[in-house]
């Protein structure tokens, strides 16, 4: 009996000694990247819907394609920002939330020049909003994360760095982006409109384009520029001259839209 009690005490001692090591091992898995994604994931939505695209050639005709992209919730009432090219021409916009529920959404306003748009998600329940960082103090070489609906695979996470700042990019004769963030975080079709995050899980940009034929050259619109455009899109006098009576202001956990 004495020996048995001694073995039990010894086993208990070693278990208590090993426990902090196990806890530390678990903490090592929960890296800053993991925490950043956990912080931001629920505020990122998948956008999809059918659109008609005009073919070229003698027998040109409109063909139906499945559009896809990503959006970021900036107000708990369901206002989200995305790229205009994601929702341009989509007749019925649908949004899949982080919970897996799919709901309808509508285009509120857009700015074709900057390729930004605001949509309103049809929901009664408040939605999680993204935490906003700033693009005023970005550092070349700092770690960033891209989160989005890459090739239809929802909430795909890729990691990279800020490769350069203040890039001007011409993607077509009629579309020029200015003052972009360049990153080597993988940005694929479907990522458009999704957030570029810093290591704290704060949105520092909206992913918008990749360099065709290149690897590791993607671009994002700086968040400070995004907020300026969104404020204008949701102001009383709209770019498209539509009255909504909404004013956007930044706050600690997102952009609150006041009526």
Could you tell me what each predicted segment is?
Residues 1-10:
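Bacterial N-terminal signal peptides that target proteins for export
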Residues 9-18:
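Bacterial N-terminal signal peptides
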Residues 24-258:
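Serine-dependent protease modules
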């Amino acid at each position: 009996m004495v020996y048995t009690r001694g073995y039990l005490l010894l086993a208990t001692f070693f278990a208590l000694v090993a426990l902090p090591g196990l806890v530390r091992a678990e903490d090592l898995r929960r890296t800053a990247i993991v925490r950043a994604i956990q912080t931001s994931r629920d505020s990122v939505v998948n956008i999809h819907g059918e659109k008609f695209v005009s073919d070229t050639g003698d027998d040109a005709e409109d063909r139906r394609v499945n559009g896809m992209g990503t959006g970021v919730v900036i107000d708990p009432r369901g206002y989200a920002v995305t790229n205009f090219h994601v929702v341009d021409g989509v007749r019925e916009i649908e949004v899949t939330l982080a919970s897996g529920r799919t709901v309808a959404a509508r285009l509120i306003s857009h700015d074709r020049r900057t390729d930004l748009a605001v949509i309103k998600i049809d929901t009664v329940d408040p939605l999680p909003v993204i935490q906003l960082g700033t693009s005023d103090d970005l550092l070349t070489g700092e770690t960033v994360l891209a989160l989005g609906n890459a090739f239809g695979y929802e909430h795909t996470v890729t990691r990279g760095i800020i490769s350069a700042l203040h890039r001007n990019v011409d993607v077509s004769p009629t579309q020029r982006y200015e003052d972009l963030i360049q990153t080597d975080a993988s940005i694929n079709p479907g990522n458009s409109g999704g957030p570029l995050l810093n290591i704290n899980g704060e949105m520092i940009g909206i992913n918008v384009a990749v360099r065709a034929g290149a690897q590791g050259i993607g671009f994002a619109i700086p968040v400070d520029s995004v907020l300026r455009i969104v404020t204008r899109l949701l102001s009383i006098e709209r770019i498209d001259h539509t009255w909504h009576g909404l004013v956007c202001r930044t706050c600690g956990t997102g952009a609150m839209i006041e009526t």
